[in-house]
Amino acid sequence: LTAKDEVLLYKDAVSKDALFRRLYALYEISRGAKCIVADVEALMQIFPKKLPVLKLKEGEDVDFSSLASRLTAMGYVRSAAVESKGAFALRGDILDIFPVNAENPARVDFFGDTAEKIKPYNFITGERLPLVKELSVCAATDVFFEEGEQRRVKEILFGELSDFKDAA
């Protein structure tokens, strides 16, 4: 478990590898990992109470209409093509996603709200890997808002912005 990089001056805006490794460690802890290797700084930091995980299972229903907003709330970035961890693409009834807790991205074929096939693939070669019955997608961020909190924060920020505009 790595420490969270808090100094903005040193943050690498392009690479989220350290964050994803940290989230993967938290995901494994939530699944009952027996051993944790961490330095004191990492242990002294605040962790989310619960790490959101989206489970996609072959033959089970998911609210497809809210899938994009759910993934975005979990820190995933929507893109035209999935080229790195933390990205997803929706085209018709197909979801391509690269979970931060997976070695490879996967394509999930939907029929309506039902996940029909889950097909991992090698994102470098495009080679199809064996089908899986289930795909766990853990959060790609460690900052979460409860239902309603996001609206409250938005109102506060717009209020502050309005005050700032009035002062100018």
Where are these regions (language model features)?
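ASCE RecA-like P-loop NTPase motor cores
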Residues: 1-168
